[in-house]
Amino acid sequence: MLKKAAIFGLAGVMAVAAGCGSNKDAGNANSNEAKIALLTTTTGGAAAYGESIKAGAELAVSEINADANAVKINLLVEDTKGDKNEAINAMNKVIAKDKVVAVIGPMLSGEMMAAGPVANKSKVVALGTSTTAEGITDIGDYIFRNAVPESLAVDTAIKEAHKTLGFKTAAIMYSNNNDQMVSVNNTARKALESVGVQIVDTETFADKDTDFSAQLTKIQQAKPDVIIVASLYQEGALIMKKMREMGMNQPVVGSNGFNSPQFIKIAGDAANGVIVGTPWFPNKEDQKVKDFRKAYVAKYGKEPDQFAAQAYDAVYLYEAALKKAGSTTDREKFREALKNIADFVGVTG
């Protein structure tokens, strides 16, 4: 069972940098329909996140387009493959060739760090639904997110876990070629130090690694009370399985990457004892959440996860901004409208 240690809502989380500037309209033969690009990862090691994001976004679009009072959306999906160069190429394509009014994505923090400047320079809004690393919204005035940053999620998860478990020592294990996980390491160190926890070991690995024996042996020798793991779901699940196989039964605080059903599917019983912060609570007594779950299950035959929920919210947030802007093509009006939305409530909060 995956334990949820902290509750987060989106209110006040979406960081917005104020600014101004002229901009060209997005080209669109049908002025009653807005072209929105979704840059996500549907192939590669992070595909489970991307498939959920795509599913959540497409469900929202289908609902919006069936509503006579809504602004119609034409969603153009690009697979970035979890690769920074692919993300840059996709961003250039949807802005210059497809002439979208705005972009959702890219999916990974590293992709946004690479492709976000392209959108910002072109004065096209790009909103990340799962870009949780530090510095995302510092890219520029056109970069937004509705993802809970690791600086909040991991910090709170560690501090709440410390209140309950009272651990005195910790080890950190993170992917050092992943911008998001490097960010988690920085946040985790600050959070642990702030509550007087001694960090007895830090180990690194790379995305797509499959053998973690050497790192875990060193951590085992350090005998920490708790282990912080920052990884995507595949690596995280393999780390958990190897830990339990080695007799390491310490509680684990995981990064946002653990918030995928695939993590539990791969890790199995080894996922027991994991603590992770999430903005998504499917059992919340809220009609929007109930309706979303019902529609998602009816369309896809499975329950939505956090990534689907955040993408679903992003599309509805964009529709609200389009309506407020009064245009389906004016990129600058869209940005101003999005920046000034203060009362949006979605399925994640």
Segments from the language model and where they lie:
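Hydrophobic alpha-helical segments within soluble ligand-binding/sensing domains
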Residues: A87, N146-T169, V182-V184, D211-F212, ...
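Beta-alpha junction/loop-to-helix N-cap segments that form part of ligand/metal-binding clefts
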Residues: K24-A26, Y49-I53, E63, D67-G135, ...
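Extracytoplasmic "Venus flytrap"
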Residues: A37-G56, E78-N85, M107-L108, M173-V182, ...
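Segments of small-molecule ligand-sensing domains
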Residues: K299-Y300, P304-A308, A320-G349
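Extracellular/periplasmic periplasmic-binding protein-like sensory domains
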Residues: M243-Y312, K324
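Short, low-complexity disordered leader/linker segments with a strong preference
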Residues: M1-K35, A66-N69
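An alpha-beta-alpha
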Residues: I143-T204, V226, Y318, L322
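Extracellular/periplasmic bilobed ligand-binding domains
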Residues: A119, N185-G277
